[in-house]
Amino acid sequence: MRELIRLVSSAGTGHFYTTDKNKRTTPDKIEIKKYDPVVRKHVVYKEAKIK
């Protein structure tokens, strides 16, 4: 049961990545440090629903 999710930048730039995750193995929200090209730094990306 893989579900599409959106990883939104915590820097407030509006940049996001889309990915999928297995809801059964990881039921809690994901927080990953990824590169934000708008601010040119690695920042924390938090999971959000795809609208």
UniProtKB/Swiss-Prot annotation:
Superkingdom of origin: Bacteria
Keyword hit for Transcription: no
Pfam families: Ribosomal_L33
Originating species: Pseudomonas putida (strain ATCC 47054 / DSM 6125 / CFBP 8728 / NCIMB 11950 / KT2440)
An annotated GO BP: translation
Similarity comment: family membership: Belongs to the bacterial ribosomal protein bL33 family.
GO CC list: cytosolic large ribosomal subunit
Keyword entries, A-Z: Ribonucleoprotein, Ribosomal protein
Protein name stated in the entry: Large ribosomal subunit protein bL33
Any one Gene Ontology molecular-function term assigned to this protein's record: structural constituent of ribosome
